From Swiss-Prot:
Superkingdom field: Bacteria
EC number(s) per entry: 5.3.1.9
Task of the protein: Catalyzes the reversible isomerization of glucose-6-phosphate to fructose-6-phosphate.
Family according to the record: Belongs to the GPI family.
Listed name of the protein: Glucose-6-phosphate isomerase 2
The entry's keywords: Cytoplasm, Gluconeogenesis, Glycolysis, Isomerase
Primary localization class, coarse: cytoplasm
CDD domains the UniProt entry points to: SIS_PGI_1, SIS_PGI_2
Pathway membership, UniProt: Carbohydrate biosynthesis; gluconeogenesis; Carbohydrate degradation; glycolysis; D-glyceraldehyde 3-phosphate and glycerone phosphate from D-glucose: step 2/4
Annotated catalytic residues: 353, 384, 505
A cellular component annotation (GO) from this entry: cytosol
GO MF terms, alphabetically ordered: carbohydrate derivative binding; glucose-6-phosphate isomerase activity; monosaccharide binding
Length: 542
């Protein structure tokens, strides 16, 4: 149990000692320059400045001691070795093998996986090339112009985010669309813009039974059949990412066009697998390989760099420091990079579904807070929305600023303004503004002074990418995966299962039948009343 470790107890005492120390005091004179240099780490084209955190040398020493006592490095090595680190499902968590090079030698539970991974990548490459070149055609012989990815959770968020992030430099190819929600509006508005004869659907569901995905897939199939596509032609317009060959064939998809993946690939870690088929189609397979290469570079860094120079290790330790010892409830992710506007949502699933747990590996209750709420939007938009709370609110919210050194457009002056605002926000959170400084500015009467004071002492990381391309994005995402793993190891929880999503899905099935007219089942009074109201409304509109 992590909370019983001596380093954990020492960190509790240490947190109480420095809770009211202001970071401004650590940035005066030469010590500030030394701190900035000491608390900056570079790897894989990423630079992390974590100097603006509420940590001293003693804090860091204790955090690294906690990592040793919690055996984080040994747990990491077990994950890379393909051991069953997903303890509740007795599975390996070997997403790193998806971006491996020949000879890296990954094994899942002792079984080599390189040949299987290589075979699927080759299948993906052929498919992406055929679709992008126009040699894959629809039923009437025309090239595919639009590809719709139907999936949810990890089968949607990761590919959607990557395609959005890298779309600016993508060579011409088919347009990509993503449908996830079972709300019919999501699918209807997408299909309304498309020509069935030149549309291809990728259905992503490991079991081919996911409720939302299969409801959308069946509706899409009906749409094709209403728009001139025959049952025998459906195979030209559907492919599947799944492991359920029989269900895929029964749906009408040629099993030859089924792209498999494995039970050692968790959904939120799966964009590197066949789940990333939409990415390969959108950006081309060469750039998909670059995405994998960036992730592999970060894998090697995480596996081999000492903890004090290890990006995922440092970030995971800081996350636990704030959540478990300083009591923060959330973390803001602010990419000052418009193409990364979906990154906060991706990280939200990655961290909160992985570590939103209250029991440890052995089933014992966790005695510390886990999985901070991850949220945010792009800068500078966030400055005009929620940054008021981050600067002057009553709760402490650590911020991750993410920026790219190379601009994303040729418009003069925009990128310098973007970077200036990013760096200024971090400085403002650190420094704050005292009442004396407000008075010295001479712009406010005394009654207004308290409203213009900024406490400061609000922590942030700044992560700089050399440029936003496939390689650096791959490194950034793999770093986030490993950061999440470090959090879980420190809390002694399993970051690779998600039992918490199951109960609601199970309860939805009988409710759906009741809404369709089946006899009422036992529910709490509130839920029963909601079902009656919805059923009565539906009946009155029939």
């Amino acid at each position: 149990m992590s909370t019983s470790l001596s380093a954990w107890q020492s960190l509790r005492e240490h947190a109480a000692k420095i809770r009211h120390t202001h970071m401004r005091d650590w940035f005066t004179g030469p010590q500030g320059q030394a701190r900035s240099v000491r608390l900056t780490v570079e790897a894989c084209g990423l630079t992390l400045d974590y100097a603006k955190n509420r940590v001293t040398e003693d804090t860091l020493s204790l955090l690294f001691a906690l990592a040793r006592q919690a055996r984080v490095c040994e747990r990491r090595d077990a994950m890379f070795a393909g051991e069953p680190v997903n303890t509740t499902e007795r599975r390996a968590a070997l997403h790193m093998a998806l971006r491996a090079h020949p000879g890296d030698g990954y094994r899942a539970l002792g079984v080599p996986v390189e040949a299987d991974v290589s075979a699927v990548l080759a299948q993906m490459e052929r498919f992406a090339r055929d679709v992008r070149s126009g040699s894959w055609t629809g039923f009437d012989g025309r090239a595919i112009t639009d590809v719709v990815n139907i999936g949810i959770g990890g089968s949607d968020l990761g590919p959607r985010m990557v395609c959005r992030a890298l779309e600016q430099d993508t060579e011409p190819g088919p347009r990509l669309h993503f449908v996830a929600n079972v709300d019919g509006y999501d699918l209807a508005r997408t299909l309304a813009r498309l020509d069935a004869a030149t549309t291809l659907v990728i259905v992503c569901s490991k079991t081919f039974t996911t409720l939302e995905t299969m409801a959308n897939a069946r509706t899409a199939r009906d749409w094709f059949l209403r728009h001139g596509v025959t049952h025998s032609d459906l195979a030209r317009h559907f492919v599947a990412v799944s492991t359920n060959r029989d269900a895929v064939a029964a749906f009408g998809i040629d099993p030859v066009n089924m792209f498999p993946f494995w039970d050692w690939v968790g959904g939120r870690f799966s964009l590197w697998s066949a789940v990333g088929l939409s990415i390969a189609v959108a950006i081309g397979f060469d750039r998909f390989r670059q995405l994998l290469d960036g992730a592999r570079a970060m894998d090697r860094h995480f596996a081999g760099a000492p903890p004090e120079q290890n990006l995922p290790m440092i970030l995971g330790l800081l996350d636990v420091w704030y959540r478990s010892f300083l009591g923060t409830a959330s973390r803001c992710v602010a990419p000052y990079c418009e193409p990364l506007d979906l990154l906060p949502a991706f990280l939200q699933q990655l961290e909160m579904e992985s570590n939103g747990k209250s029991v440890q590996h052995d089933g014992a209750a966790l005695e510390a807070g886990s999985a901070a709420v991850v949220w945010g939007t792009t800068g500078t938009n966030g400055q005009h929305a929620y940054f008021q709370m981050v600067h002057q609110g009553s709760q402490l919210v650590p911020v991750d600023f993410i920026a790219c050194l190379q601009p994303h457009s040729d418009l003069p002056g925009h990128h310098t303004k973007l970077l200036a605002n990013c760096f200024a926000q971090g400085e403002a959170l650190l420094r704050g503004r005292t009442a004396d400084e407000v008075r010295a500015e001479g712009k406010a009467d005394e009654a207004l002074v308290p409203h213009l004071v900024f406490e400061g002492n609000r922590p942030s990381n700044t992560l700089l990418l050399q440029r936003l391309d496939a390689f650096h994005l791959g490194a950034l995402l793999a770093m986030s995966e490993h950061r999440t793993f470090v959090q879980g190891a420190l809390w002694n929880i399993n970051p690779f299962d998600q039992w918490g999503v199951e109960l609601g899905k199970m309860l939805a099935r009988p409710i759906e039948r009741e809404l369709e007219g089946a006899p009422p089942q036992p529910h709490d009074a509130s839920t029963a009343a909601l079902i009656r109201r919805a059923a009565q409304f539906c009946a009155s509109t029939d």
